[in-house]
From Swiss-Prot:
Official protein name in the record: Putative zinc finger protein 302L
Recorded GO MF terms: zinc ion binding
Family: Belongs to the IIV-6 302L family.
Keyword annotations from UniProtKB, A to Z: Metal-binding, Zinc, Zinc-finger
Domain of life: Viruses
Zn-finger (C2H2-type) residues: 3-25
Amino acid sequence: MDIVCEFCDKSFDSKSKVNAHQRTKKCQQFRTITFVCRKCSSAILGYDNILFHVENCNGTTPILHKEIEDKIKVKNHNKEHDNKIFFGKGLNGKTVYIFNYEKSMLTYGSTNIISESIVSTIDNLVEKATLKSLNDAIQSFSKESFLQEILFKYPQPFSISDISKFFEYESRTVMAFLMAKDLNDLFEILFKECKLFPVCIVNDDIYVIDKVVRQNLDKWILEWKQIDYKEVSLSLKGFFLPVLNYAIKLFLNESNNNTTLKLLELIKEIADETKIRKLMSTFTKPIPVFEDIQNIFQNVKYIYNGSYKHTPMDTFIKNISYGSCFVKEKSIKTEHELYSLLMSLTKESEKTALIKKIKMNDNDDIVEIEKEMKLLKV
């Protein structure tokens, strides 16, 4: 079965060949370019595909820049009715609206980015979890290799959405990183390398973008919403759900080892609201200062120039909020249970009892875990 490079629209017969191709300069340098043929108005991705199309296109009706811009405007006009506004540059340098914005979802559901089903995650991601597989990953691990692996899968500028997907699909890699390094290193990658608009902290209060309003062609107003850091602390846990599932399976397979106990200590740090808040303060930045910014933060608003390219902080909040991570009521309950379960495993007597009582296999349901946890009074 052919595998297609998402950047170049080019097919390969194996995943290894796709990976090798995506490391090449040709793929990396031209992956952000979309060619629009003026003969047939087709949009083509990939350097080789562009050259092939130019040589073989039989289109006879030229398309003008103005027509392309008109199409963009019509498309963006329709988008505005879905509460999405766009801003950017047309082919001749003229301003058009292609600025991507989605309303912040702090307390209500959105699309599922992190695992919707805890059971399915355990079955699919960590079926063969063993201490050996974890130790093998740790042996050649470094902060740099972790960052490079993320950058390879999600070339910069990557988003928090990319990071959350990486956590879901690469739970063993994340677990190895936590064992080899610490939360501070992990947060440094998440907050320093990811291209996003910063959280604003003023007098220990945390603000995120709640609404973006277009004032005119170049000026926009960002309305800020103050949030409780406990919400952010809870939200960050969503990243670690696949890793927690991996940890549960690892305990059931090989319970008596220092490696898994060390991981649980790290997980306890994640649940420490004071520590999370301190890390948030370390890696967040004040409101950026530019000559064209009129700072009126006292009114929880400020104006900036529309040509400044950034990813609104609402993207970050939406993708890791408990609204998106735990859409279903059952999932919310499960998240708390998983943490309680892992906390209980640090106590030797409860850990032994739990491992003895819970036998996880392909047909297990989360209800069985609930029953056993009630017996343990977790």
